[in-house]
Design a protein with these regions (language model features):
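Short, internal strand/loop/helix patches
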Residues: 108-145, 151
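Bacterial N-terminal signal peptides that target proteins for export
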Residues: 1-9
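N-terminal "domain-start" segment that seeds a small globular fold
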Residues: 20-47
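Thiol-/selenol-based redox modules, centered on thioredoxin-like
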Residues: 143-165
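Short active-site neighborhood of thiol/selenol oxidoreductases, capturing the structured segment around
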Residues: 47-68
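Loop/turn elements at helix/coil->beta-strand transitions in domains of secreted/extracellular proteins
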Residues: 51-55, 84-88, 116-120, 146
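Structural microenvironment flanking redox-active thiols in thiol-disulfide oxidoreductases
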Residues: 68-114, 125-130
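Bacterial N-terminal signal peptides
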Residues: 8-18
């Protein structure tokens, strides 16, 4: 009986995740006050990071091959965001067995150091933000304008390995 209930719960949570949809364009920033820990131990919220012209939220992780393919552009993206007065934050939504799968805070610190990241890389405890955003893949970005309204959601660019100019 317990096994059946467990299987039903697992199936229903997977079913929900698979069919989750990203928030629609025009949506306000979800859960902007939730504090997340970044790799330096600092606690930040999306409101803390948002700048005059908006906010770029990047859902990412350490172990996804697609994330690795885009890594060389993360610092460029953070720099371009800052130059345009747009806040930039990368959020790791992986929560289940985080440490066992290479997604723990120490793993994130090592990963970030290996790529010389120069931006906030935070932990989304319990995947609360990922679920609120409807983020279902990594990397996946959400760009909000100065009013905190979503104007773009999707991939970083047209090709993870060789972007078109």
């Amino acid at each position: 009986m317990l096994r059946s209930i467990k299987n039903i719960l697992i199936f229903s949570s997977l079913f929900t995740f698979i069919f989750a949809e990203a928030i629609p364009l025009g949506s306000k920033i979800p859960l902007p006050e939730i504090k997340m820990e970044d790799i330096s131990g600092k606690k930040v919220s999306l409101n803390d990071v948002k700048m005059e012209n908006g906010l770029l939220v990047n859902f990412s992780c350490n172990t996804c091959p697609w994330v690795h393919a885009w890594q060389d552009r993360y610092n460029e993206l953070a720099k371009a965001s800052a130059e345009n007065n747009i806040g930039f934050i990368t959020i790791n939504p992986n929560s289940r067995n985080r440490e066992k799968i290479g997604e723990g805070l120490k793993d994130m610190q090592k990963f970030s150091n290996n790529y010389d990241h120069d931006f906030l890389y935070t932990v989304d405890e319990g995947s609360k933000l990922a679920m609120a955003f409807g983020a279902t893949q990594t990397p996946q970005v959400f760009l909000f304008d100065s009013n905190g309204k979503l104007v773009y959601q999707g991939v970083i660019d047209d090709n993870p390995r060789k972007p078109k100019k």
